[in-house]
From Swiss-Prot:
Cystine bridges: none
NCBIfam families (UniProt xref): PRK05260.1 (NF003615)
Intracellular or extracellular location(s): Cytoplasm, Nucleoid
Subunit structure: Interacts, and probably forms a ternary complex, with MukE and MukB via its C-terminal region. The complex formation is stimulated by calcium or magnesium. It is required for an interaction between MukE and MukB.
One CC-aspect GO term: cytoplasm
Region Leucine-zipper, annotated ranges: 209-237
GO molecular function, one term: calcium ion binding
GO biological process: cell division; chromosome condensation; chromosome segregation; DNA replication
Gene from which the chain derives: mukF
Family label: Belongs to the MukF family.
Protein name as it appears in the record: Chromosome partition protein MukF
UniProt keyword terms in alphabetical order: Calcium, Cell cycle, Cell division, Chromosome partition, Cytoplasm, DNA condensation
Amino acid sequence: MQHELAQTIPELILWTKEREFSLSLSSDRLAFLLAIALYNNERTDGELLESDLQDIFRHVSNAFEQSEATQTQRANNAINDLVKQRFLNRFSSEFTEGLAIYRLTPLGVGVSEYYIRQREFSTLRLSIQLSIVADEIQRASNAAEEGGDERFWRNQVFAPLKFSVAEIFDSIDLSQRMMDENQQQIRERIAMLLSQNWHEAIATCQQLLDETSGNLRELQDVLNASGDKLQSQLLRIQSCLIGRDDLDFVDQLIVNLQNKLDRIISWGQQAIDLWIGYDRHVHKFIRTAIDMDKNRVFGQRLRQSIQDYFESPWQLYIAKAEPLLDLRDDETELNEAEAVGELPTELEYESLTQVQEQIIATMQAHLAPFREQGKPIDLGAILREQLAMYPLSRHFDVARIIVDQAVKLGMASQDSQAIYPEWQSINDNGAEVQANVIDQYNK
């Protein structure tokens, strides 16, 4: 009876220690390895001569603007380094007269594949992968229902699930992680655009947001369409294992595949939700920037566009909502005195304008020193401090005025970096605020 190989963490650590594995690839070394892999894919024999590697290194050296005087020596060092780190295997014998033959190792193929191929993740590729998985699982489930001895299960069920389905799941998982990295790069690019020239970058940012959101949704639709069918086929195989204690290794594999599939689908949806949150955060930042701009930039752009209209014509689109039907009856207007009656002195109306003017004057006097001294404004702390001085009935108006006055003074640098602030309690009745510290003041 064969036993499924299993490695524990201590075994893997010992295995790595015994073989003295060590990886270190600078940018030029990595570029050299990727160039070798790409060149190797175009060859039918998969073998490389040292002269081939020298030529490839010359292209890399020129791209990195390195000295030509030491090119041969640096090429030899780079080749030896890749051999030492087990990215390349070197073969030589007395028949080759000192001319070595090189082949990429599995590690070299894996690293280069990661950088070159995994970026080709697309809906078409995902559909093909899931189609292959569905066929393999279908054949395995049919074989499981036929039944047989342990050898039959290993060859007809375990083998295709282990060496085809599981590897494709791992490939999809790796592709998702590549998309995570791509999203992070897009976030950094958007942050850079908004911090440099946000009013010119709005269209570019919107395009990046829409493209990424569309790609995530399209890929998730493909996963959702296939996920339930794949899970049902795995359950079908699992039902055939009832009462077969000798097939525990197959049952464990099925559980692992179910977990992988659940993780892939779950993370795909979670990635969409996180991106939607980021999308809203960027739009909130842009709206805040527009509100604080006081129409200076957009006014200048509009005037310039009108002046240059004949040289660069443009179109103006106007969106107008349909007017709502007025259902009120003007003839049945109520007399205020009849409808309300006479109010007690305690309930007499106090002009909201007067209240607002008093609060605005107080807040301006309170916030001005922060700008003059360059101190950051923590809205959460200020709101807690000020609301404690007012009755609960005025908390909303006071909080709104404080926020309006604060954002007129400046903005938070963390907003442009898409950093989500924590919710802070601002009174004893459950009111909370979410705001980064304002640390950049308008000139």
